[in-house]
Swiss-Prot record:
Keyword Nucleotide-binding (UniProt): yes
Region span, C: 553-625
One GO MF term: ATP hydrolysis activity
Organism: Buchnera aphidicola subsp. Schizaphis graminum (strain Sg)
Key words, A-Z: ATP-binding, Chaperone, Cytoplasm, Nucleotide-binding, Stress response
UniProt record similarity statement: Belongs to the heat shock protein 90 family.
Subunit structure: Homodimer.
Location of the protein in the cell: Cytoplasm
Record function comment: Molecular chaperone. Has ATPase activity.
Name used for this protein in its record: Chaperone protein HtpG
UniProt region (B), positions on chain: 338-552
Gene Ontology CC terms, in alphabetical order: cytoplasm
Length: 625
């Protein structure tokens, strides 16, 4: 080894923390280190295949791709090597000294507080890759050279995982990467051939590159290499020949998820656009699914050649939880992310994959309600972005949505729109719903009093996305949606409002005039209502104006919100209203009316512009009683 230049580096602080957590966490599933290293080696070979399309010289006269594993019991080492793309010195610093993932700091911070079993699961989910070597190793060395570079541009990386690493310039005859693990004394089980073969069979059987292990022929006294995996792309096989276990292990390899997938769909499509898709629905949401920089998307292959990870050209954002791959026969091998965006083939594939994904969810919802509920609890809020993003598939998306309602007596969202419609009253014209900040707030809204009395179900929407979603979800199966906190003629029919108002007494008419004079332009209008049973008054939004919940969303996003003026509705049958109606003293009357408006606004909005004034007025009126 000709050493030319040696430097000492410190790990990025997040790497130090992660290594410390792994080394000292007694990680229970230690064998995954080999899966991670083989997966990295396979990716390196995929990248070389792709780059050599435009630059064949990268092959260096060696196109026999392979991953090799050798054991040296006397030295206590396990060596994993590949003849893939390799790394430059800069690549080594960036890939083996840092973690270039957004949200890493917050992830590690949350990890430190978790219980051991949850911590182990999250470590696997985050995808620690190469760093998992330190779970079983006291020291790790990496020898690598980037394909196409001179032999004297090899790099040696060494570390014990305690805070620093060394990088040395070396000569390396062959391209690719060789990782040597100096195993801890208590991890010597990984020096046994049967153990390594078992791990490869369990996790890496589907790797498209041959994984070979070095063995010794006692009879002929020679070492030889034996292939120990199938080395065939799982997605290219007939799905009738693939076991459930094989799909599950392939999913884990593809995603770094430690859990089995909830459901999957494997399809070979022939015709104008020939492609294979293998789509998975995870059991749990990724830790960073709400991170704007979350790298979602499908793995893209063209004619079995790996092109890129996380291609977002084939699925919209509301389906970002779906994992998997697409292998196209029609896209060009030199396709880039930019070309994908404007490619007609891509657009056709996207339409097909969206349909395929939604149909997969539909199948799951009909085939296994329990599993679909698991899916909904994890990803329902993400799918709710669909109506705003995908008008072409609105009805299909709507059929997949789940809600809770006043008749459900539970906050669990498990009612489909089909089920709601099937339980509608014979003369019920619309699908009623209410949006609120929480389930409890929605469940106890005074707007529900009439519906409880008449046994009419109302959907209770309390996710942050709900109000936004309902702007796009306007009808389903011919039934329009109606917010019960907005003015609507169908609500008037339920209470025979017009008939009741014809019988309004002169005294009550004068009362309304007096209320309007007191409130002035604080409200849009004042009127009586007969849909309240326990509450003296409520406020309603005009049917054409912004709702309360939408105003909250705009405000939370830092956008300007127009002043909301509500319709003030008063229940003439409530004892408090009847008592206030008889008050002759103008100042006292005004105070009571202002208090009632504040109560109604507080019930609607959950806050008041001047809570101190409200408290003072309440205290004053209580003392006067």
């Amino acid at each position: 080894m000709n050493i030319q230049k040696k430097e000492v580096y410190s790990f990025q602080s997040e790497v130090k923390q992660l290594l410390h957590l792994m080394i000292h966490s007694l990680y229970s599933n230690k064998e995954i280190f080999l899966r991670e290293l083989i997966s990295n080696a396979s990716d390196a070979i995929d990248k070389l295949r792709f780059q050599s399309i435009s630059n064949p010289e990268l092959y260096e006269n060696d196109s026999d791709f392979k991953i090799q594993i050798s054991i040296n019991k006397s030295q206590g080492t396990l060596i994993i090597s590949d003849n893939g793309i390799g790394m430059t010195r800069q690549d080594v610093v960036e890939n083996l000294g840092t973690i270039a993932k957004s949200g890493t700091k917050s992830f590690i911070k949350s990890l430190e507080k978790k219980e051991k079993n949850v911590k182990n699961e999250l470590i696997g989910e985050f995808g620690v890759g190469f760093y998992s070597s330190f779970i079983v190793s006291k020291k790790v060395s990496v020898r690598t050279r980037f394909a196409g570079s001179k032999s004297n541009l090899g790099v040696l990386w060494e570390s014990s995982g305690e805070g620093e690493y060394n990088i040395t310039d070396i000569k390396k005859k062959t391209r690719g990467t060789e990782i040597t693990l100096f195993l801890k004394k208590e991890e010597e089980e990984f020096l046994e051939l049967w153990r390594i073969e078992g791990i490869v069979s369990k996790y890496s059987d589907h790797i498209t590159v041959p994984v070979k292990i070095q063995k010794y022929d006692e009879k002929n006294k020679i070492y030889f290499w034996e292939k120990i995996n199938k080395a065939k792309a799982l997605w290219t096989q007939n799905k009738a020949t693939i076991s459930e276990k094989e799909y599950q292990e392939f999913y884990k390899h593809l995603t770094n998820d430690q859990n089995n997938p909830l459901f999957w769909s494997h399809n070979h499509v022939e015709g104008i656009n020939e492609y294979i898709s293998l789509l998975f629905i995870p059991e749990k949401a990724a830790w960073d699914i709400w991170n704007r920089d979350n790298k979602s998307g499908l793995k893209l292959y063209v004619k079995r050649v790996y092109i890129m990870d996380n291609s977002q050209a084939f699925l919209p954002n509301y389906l970002r939880f779906i994992r998997g791959l697409i292998d196209s026969n029609n896209l060009p091998l030199n396709v880039s992310r930019e070309i994908l965006q404007d490619n007609s083939i891509t657009q056709n594939l996207k339409k097909a994959l969206i349909k395929r994904s939604l149909k997969m969810l539909q199948t799951l919802s009909k085939k296994d309600n329990e599993k679909y509920q698991i899916f909904w609890n994890q990803f329902g809020s993400v799918l709710k972005e669909g109506p705003a993003e995908d008008s072409n598939n609105l009805n299909l998306i709507a059929s997949l949505l789940r809600f809770t309602s006043i008749q459900n007596n539970s906050s669990e969202q498990n009612i489909s729109l089909e089920k709601y419609i099937s339980n509608m009253h014979e003369k019920q014209e619309k699908i009623y719903y209410i949006t609120a900040d929480s389930y409890t707030s929605a469940k106890n809204s005074p707007h529900l009093e009439l519906f409880n009395k008449k046994n009419i179900d109302v959907l209770l929407l309390s996710d942050r996305i709900d109000e936004w979603m309902m702007n796009y979800l306007t009808e389903f199966e011919g039934k329009k949606f109606q917010s019960i906190s907005k003015e609507d003629l169908s609500l008037n029919k339920l209470t025979k409002e017009n008939e009741n108002k014809k019988e309004t007494s002169t005294e009550m008419i004068e009362f309304l005039k007096k209320v309007k004079k007191t409130l002035g332009d604080k409200v849009k209008s004042v009127r009586l209502t007969y849909r309240l049973t326990e509450t003296p008054c409520i406020v309603l939004s005009d049917s054409n104006e912004m709702s309360t919940q939408m105003a909250k969303l705009f405000s939370a996003a830092g956008q300007s919100v127009p002043e909301l003026k509500y319709i003030f509705e008063i229940n003439p049958e409530h004892k408090l209203i009847q008592k206030i109606c008889k008050i002759k003293e103008n100042e006292k009357f005004d105070e009571w009316i202002k208090l009632l408006l504040d109560q109604a606004l507080f019930a609607e909005k959950g806050n008041l512009e001047n809570p101190h004034e409200f408290i003072a007025r309440t205290n004053k009126l209580i003392l006067e009683q």
